[in-house]
């Protein structure tokens, strides 16, 4: 089984983009070249601020969904290490 990772990228306007991949370095390089998500194209210098192993693809997708539901403050707490990523992986899914 291939290991998937969840990552957060900070844009120059301080927004946080959340994504999943099997290779964080490759995917971040794609984003920097403008070959990744449309949401990041033309946004200027990007900074990878968080990445963590998320298990299988389905587990990574669930964690990505949960993180995208967080407030900006909660995402900043995750980046700062004040909110445990493991809690995002194991939290019950919202209907």
Curated annotation (Swiss-Prot):
This is UPF0213 protein ESA_03545. Belongs to the UPF0213 family. It comes from Cronobacter sakazakii (strain ATCC BAA-894). Residues 2-77 form the GIY-YIG domain. SUPFAM superfamilies: GIY-YIG endonuclease. HAMAP family: UPF0213. It comes from the Bacteria. Pfam families: GIY-YIG.
């Amino acid at each position: 089984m291939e290991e998937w990772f969840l990552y957060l990228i900070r844009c120059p306007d301080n927004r946080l983009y959340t994504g999943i991949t099997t290779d964080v370095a490759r995917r971040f390089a794609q984003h920097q070249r403008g070959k990744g998500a449309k949401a990041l194209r033309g946004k200027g210098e990007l900074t990878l601020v968080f990445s963590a192993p998320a298990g299988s693809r389905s587990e990574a997708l669930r964690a990505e969904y949960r993180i995208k539901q967080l407030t900006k403050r909660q995402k900043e707490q995750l980046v700062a290490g004040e909110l445990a990523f493991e809690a995002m992986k194991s939290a019950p899914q919202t209907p």
